[in-house]
Swiss-Prot record:
<feature type="binding site" description="in other chain">
    <location>
        <begin position="12"/>
        <end position="15"/>
    </location>
    <ligand>
        <name>IMP</name>
    </ligand>
</feature>
<dbReference type="GO" id="GO:0005525">
    <property type="term" value="F:GTP binding"/>
</dbReference>
<feature type="binding site" description="in other chain">
    <location>
        <begin position="37"/>
        <end position="40"/>
    </location>
    <ligand>
        <name>IMP</name>
    </ligand>
</feature>
<feature type="binding site">
    <location>
        <position position="135"/>
    </location>
    <ligand>
        <name>IMP</name>
    </ligand>
</feature>
<dbReference type="InterPro" id="IPR042109">
    <property type="entry name" value="Adenylosuccinate_synth_dom1"/>
</dbReference>
<comment type="function">
    <text>Plays an important role in the de novo pathway of purine nucleotide biosynthesis. Catalyzes the first committed step in the biosynthesis of AMP from IMP.</text>
</comment>
<feature type="binding site" description="in other chain">
    <location>
        <position position="230"/>
    </location>
    <ligand>
        <name>IMP</name>
    </ligand>
</feature>
<dbReference type="GO" id="GO:0046040">
    <property type="term" value="P:IMP metabolic process"/>
</dbReference>
<feature type="binding site">
    <location>
        <begin position="39"/>
        <end position="41"/>
    </location>
    <ligand>
        <name>GTP</name>
    </ligand>
</feature>
<feature type="binding site">
    <location>
        <begin position="322"/>
        <end position="324"/>
    </location>
    <ligand>
        <name>GTP</name>
    </ligand>
</feature>
<comment type="pathway">
    <text>Purine metabolism; AMP biosynthesis via de novo pathway; AMP from IMP: step 1/2.</text>
</comment>
<feature type="binding site" description="in other chain">
    <location>
        <position position="215"/>
    </location>
    <ligand>
        <name>IMP</name>
    </ligand>
</feature>
<dbReference type="InterPro" id="IPR018220">
    <property type="entry name" value="Adenylosuccin_syn_GTP-bd"/>
</dbReference>
<feature type="binding site">
    <location>
        <position position="296"/>
    </location>
    <ligand>
        <name>GTP</name>
    </ligand>
</feature>
<keyword id="KW-0436">Ligase</keyword>
<feature type="binding site">
    <location>
        <begin position="11"/>
        <end position="17"/>
    </location>
    <ligand>
        <name>GTP</name>
    </ligand>
</feature>
<protein>
    <recommendedName>
        <fullName>Adenylosuccinate synthetase</fullName>
        <ecNumber>6.3.4.4</ecNumber>
    </recommendedName>
</protein>
Amino acid sequence: MADVVVGIQWGDEGKGKIVDRIAKDYDFVVRYQGGHNAGHTIVHKGVKHSLHLMPSGVLYPKCKNIISSAVVVSVKDLCEEISAFEDLENRLFISDRAHVILPYHAKKDAFKEKSQNIGTTKKGIGPCYEDKMARSGIRMGDLLDDKILEEKLNAHFKAIEPFKKAYDLGENYEKDLMGYFKTYAPKICPFIKDTTSMLIEANQKGEKILLEGAQGTLLDIDLGTYPFVTSSNTTSASACVSTGLNPKAINEVIGITKAYSTRVGNGPFPSEDTTPMGDHLRTKGVEFGTTTKRPRRCGWLDLVALKYACALNGCTQLALMKLDVLDGIDAIKVCVAYERKGERLEAFPSDLKDCTPIYQTFKGWEKSVGVRKLDDLEPNAREYIRFIEKEVGVKIGLISTSPEREDTIFL
């Protein structure tokens, strides 16, 4: 059976800590979408690890880690991540169906961002998915056969010729790209496998599989705050499509949310707090992007968005992260509905334009940091947790009270 860990906000919810905390109980941890535009930060024994492509199970020697087919892979960046770990043989597997991000994709991404101003990371994620949908992409499995790779690259060179100047690819792009693959392909190829068959077999044997999403539900290309979204499907349903596991294989869906809200880049954010309180949340929560180091926009918990995300993903339980960031705040707000043109909205609309938050205010608490038992939380903190559970209709199974792995309350 497989369990899914999925972000139910705009990403950066703390999925990495949760996966790291529970990965020891699984045979496989699988990253199922996105690229190196995402980042997980894990603190293990006082050491901070920043992962962008590697599944969060790499810190457990007995855990097998898979990068599955809907992930887009920068071979250069993955090689750099691999070099930081030892003994990955028979512990890391990359789907032969996953698509390769080319340097051209990053150049195109940067070019388009100048006019679109979506707030992308300019890592080439979107353009790589574009080539995938156009059926002209290069897949990881192509790196295993020099002849096939050469054919695919020649087709790529022909296709991008009219755009070389606009995308600032340089006169030696073809030669440089050939050298790029000669440098990195030998380091990556030993890890490339048919992970679809591997996971189907593991599921049939009853092995435990943890499916790890990137970004968050509200950035989903179809169901998120379009056009300010990522280029992949970020919901739990994508886990089945990417891995080849059928929906019957899914057991638990764990939705990850912070005790407040954050967003990176442009796009609507009804509960954003642009007063000094927003700055306080950013500073105390260390809200800066793992990948880009950009400061995250911060605000109050949005229950309209949270209920929507829980319904989309079929969440069976929630993990409430960074409760300790709210320590010491006298009045804590929660967005319980939106108002738009005089109308109260309790359902999440396809367009958040002109939506303003309707808040309910709660009394704060002094300290929750480091608490590991529910009964040790102050009454106001417990009331806040109970309110979220009641409004969303999904039980909270886990609460994080610091970045440390052990500072976790299990319910």
